[in-house]
Amino acid sequence: MSVLAPPDISGDLLASVATLVLKGVLREWDDVSFVVDCSVMDLIGGKVDGVQLSGAKWVSPLNLTCESLRCDVGAVEIDPIALVSKQAVELRTIPVGDCVVRFNTTDFGNFLVHPEMRRAAKDAGTEWGFDFDFHGQGVVLKDGAVVFSGTRGGGGGERCVVAMRPVGPRSVEVTRVDGPCGDETTEALERFFGELAIDLLGAEVRYGDMVVDDARVTLSLTMRMLRFPSSLQGLI
């Protein structure tokens, strides 16, 4: 009687399953790549030392887009049975890490009007009176700043144009460019981005820092992976 070889439960298997699942969630992509750091024996026990995700030209179902991204998370425990039997990535612990996401002006506009950003703005409005409705059109990169617009209730719904530039970790400076943007509005925007935390399909991401050049905005984010994405969990 022949002895069947055990199923492959290596880091490559986890990377393949994670890639397949994430491609099933995204609407478009040029690249989705995972690199898993673990030994075969550790993964059999559900232990992973770290995971790196890289991607390019992503488009989500709700039109969150980016030129590229790279995320690195540390140690995590997964369910190895679910990985083999269900081809699913089910987390037993919450890994933490960092992401670097690069946006062009269209991407950043899509980010500003994404439902999770609107939810964050609404929550901030309830919590401490934030009052700014972001516009996705007309984003411009100039002199190391992102120039964008929105409307505020205190301004009677008039268009307000501001410039936002990084001034250090978890800190931005917002200045008026045009419209009814007083100190109250610019200071509120500074606080909003400095405290920004949103949930993107299981990943709780927080603003860390930003670099702006003539072609793109590069956001550095910290993250906690609360659950791995699934097409059954909703859209991003």
Indicate residue ranges for each PLM-predicted region.
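Extracellular/lumenal and peripheral-membrane lipid-interaction modules
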Residues: 1-236
